Amino acid sequence: MSDNNQCVIVGIAGASASGKSLIASTIYNELREKVGDHQIGVITEDCYYSDQSHLSMEERVKTNYDHPNALDHDLLCEHLQQLMSGNAVEVPEYSYTEHTRTSETTTLTPKKVIILEGILLLTDPRLRKLMHASVFMDTPLDICLLRRVKRDVEERGRTMDTVLKQYQETVRPMFMQFIEPSKQHADIIVPRGGKNRIAIDVLKAHIAKLLKS
């Protein structure tokens, strides 16, 4: 837990398609009614995939996106520290079709609450130290796979074959090597995915308590 009281940082980790984005958006939408639209923000770890614009498309698709080395956690840590110090940051935008950052960024101003969501957040001790609370979405892998196939085919322009190949070669092995072991660092473990109403209410109450402390 961070000792900095200027903003509350909540990290939500777990397997790909485990419900991280859903629970993050639900908490965001429900909390902003209480703390104000401009006092809560969401940062997606995917935005901090390393810039690969110097690589060919053939090289980019070979990147293991489920390994910590694929992410620029240095920049993410720097941005969180800037936000905690009261400074705005420029969050990178990432293209899933081009497999690299775009030339665009999104300005994020300091908030009372920052919700982080991403598969590998809890693997980095620097990020864990900045969090006031951490969550792990403990969704069964077979459910995650079904969701991932649907999402990647419908939203990210992938084919069924490429999604399954990536799952077998990198997604599942990296989950077992990095993501599953990081569960031990979570303050709260959420079963049954992002529609777990009890878990959402507990998280909202915990964040509200942190805001008052």
From Swiss-Prot:
InterPro entries listed in its UniProt record: P-loop_NTPase, PRK/URK, Uridine_kinase, Uridine_kinase-like
Residues reported in the UniProt entry to bind ATP: G14, A15, S16, A17, S18, G19, K20, S21
Functional pathway: Pyrimidine metabolism; CTP biosynthesis via salvage pathway; CTP from cytidine: step 1/3; Pyrimidine metabolism; UMP biosynthesis via salvage pathway; UMP from uridine: step 1/1
Compartment list: Cytoplasm
Gene Ontology molecular function: ATP binding; cytidine kinase activity; uridine kinase activity
Enzyme class: transferase
Catalytic activity: uridine + ATP = UMP + ADP + H(+); cytidine + ATP = CMP + ADP + H(+)
An annotated GO cellular component: cytoplasm
Predominant location category: cytoplasm
Superkingdom of origin: Bacteria
Family per similarity comment: Belongs to the uridine kinase family.
Protein's UniProt name: Uridine kinase
Organism of provenance: Vibrio atlanticus (strain LGP32)
